[in-house]
């Protein structure tokens, strides 16, 4: 699941994130600003990835609580 998430919401392709955020930025009619764009490119993928992985963990925890026990035993 983590590998699939990294392929979809990866931090690796900054050019792809610049293109997506830049096009949304222009669609809302904002003036292009490289500093704001680079800040959004560095923050937005991390937040999106964290929210997505947290929601997957919460879903799997509801489906099978024994996964939490397995996870804690793997950490030890």
From Swiss-Prot:
The keyword Transmembrane is assigned to this record: yes
GO molecular function terms attached to this record: antiporter activity
Annotated catalysed reactions: K(+)(in) + H(+)(out) = K(+)(out) + H(+)(in)
Membrane-crossing segments per the record: 35-52
Keywords associated with the record: Antiport, Chloroplast, Hydrogen ion transport, Ion transport, Membrane, Plastid, Plastid inner membrane, Potassium, Potassium transport, Transmembrane, Transmembrane helix, Transport
Membrane topology term: Multi-pass membrane protein
GO cellular component terms, semicolon-separated: chloroplast inner membrane
One Pfam family from the record: CemA
Organism superkingdom: Eukaryota
InterPro entries: CemA
Main location: plastid
Coiled coil (residue ranges): none
N-terminal signal peptide: none
GO biological process, alphabetically ordered: potassium ion transport; proton transmembrane transport
Cellular location(s): Plastid, Chloroplast inner membrane
The family this protein is said to belong to: Belongs to the CemA family.
Function: Contributes to K(+)/H(+) antiport activity by supporting proton efflux to control proton extrusion and homeostasis in chloroplasts in a light-dependent manner to modulate photosynthesis. Prevents excessive induction of non-photochemical quenching (NPQ) under continuous-light conditions. Indirectly promotes efficient inorganic carbon uptake into chloroplasts.
PANTHER family tied to this protein: CHLOROPLAST ENVELOPE MEMBRANE PROTEIN, CHLOROPLAST ENVELOPE MEMBRANE PROTEIN-RELATED
Protein name, UniProt field: Potassium/proton antiporter CemA
Biological source species: Vicia faba (Broad bean)
